[in-house]
């Protein structure tokens, strides 16, 4: 379920999607908000008094994600500068949960190149408190080894865990599979 610009007849929507591809995630600047899969949609709508509003739906990776405010500001600033509409709205949406399956293949490669292990493509098929301890083995983004151990399921942000590679002896973070 990778997020991509949808097929649309409105060329302005494609322009907005292209602009969003240039907005970096505040915590990992090598990956864009589109590659991370946090953009749910883009829409133009007429305003009652004339003019139009462009609305971007933003999905947080986790409830309380500290980067959401920065993402929202970056998107608003960029779209206002483009002057495609009289108003810009960025709505944080909980209509559907963000999952790690929304990260694009390019985004996964950029995570790896930045020293982060991308989340597994498929996660455990159960729920419960044991979930974090039964995460799939993480592949080291530095040497590719799977001889890794989970050091702490609580990384610097809610969406990351800390691992250690026994082969190259490097600590690294993995995006959690959700």
Language model features: what each stretch is:
Residues 61-86:
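Short, non-transmembrane amphipathic alpha-helical segments
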Residues 140-143, 165-168:
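Short cysteine-rich clusters marking metal-coordination/redox-active sites
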Residues 145-149, 173:
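Short functional micro-motifs and their immediate structural scaffolds
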Residues 152-162:
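Short linker/helix segments within small regulatory modules
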Residues 167-178:
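Short metal-binding segments enriched for Cys and/or His
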